[in-house]
């Protein structure tokens, strides 16, 4: 009987996946893809779950489960980043909050930049004030996330109205199937890696896309120096431990650990996430600190996806999330005898 009930559950999930795919191609109007605008500073965002987030961000009400699944499939990317970096994050150092002591140190540095105090500046000459540089979020191994509508990524800027962002998509597939939209510029001394730069996607957000491996860029010092107050790495479903892709990360991970900046990682399933953690433990044992314990992502996609080559392989975008950073060795003083 238990096997039969499990079979029915799988059938229901497969039916849901099929209906969601047909819904996307139905040609209907999608009100769930109309996104909320800037957030009033007096209105606090509640990041307990998807419902409280969408409500406090003043999204149009989403009254059907299917529309909710379609909306979260895109929003999971910026909101996953925002939910970890924000000062009102659902992840904390309290018992069961998953954040470690080292994680609190790293995220506190970024939050200091992302939530600056009011400067009292104005539009005139007398109102000029020094501003912090933008927070750089390096999204490595970028695939589908690099081609998301820019309105989706602007949601990240709305969560931090006083901060500036520079999103940098890096990876050989970061411009896949987008040649008609953005032809790759030639490599020149002023643009040595042929970056596609989208300036002013929002007044506080800039997006760059580079079709290359990160370790190639790192070795040139192109993004040097790195600062834990201004830099963060994001790896969406990187497949660190997957047999087909782990070799592509062997050169990259040691370089990321050198920067001492936080590295956020998501996985399609619990197995996928645990496989990545096992691979990092094997290749960099003793060289990293865990910032956030692995577990289910509060803002995972609610829509399930099916592997066409294996119907038993069911996953969802950003199901799990964890974070780590290169180990920092604090200076110690040896008292003179």
Predicted regions and their residues:
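BZIP DNA-binding basic region
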Residues: 1-2
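Positively charged, amphipathic N-terminal segments that serve as targeting/anchoring signals
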Residues: 5-232, 236
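Domain-level detector for long C-terminal conserved domains
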Residues: 176, 180-337
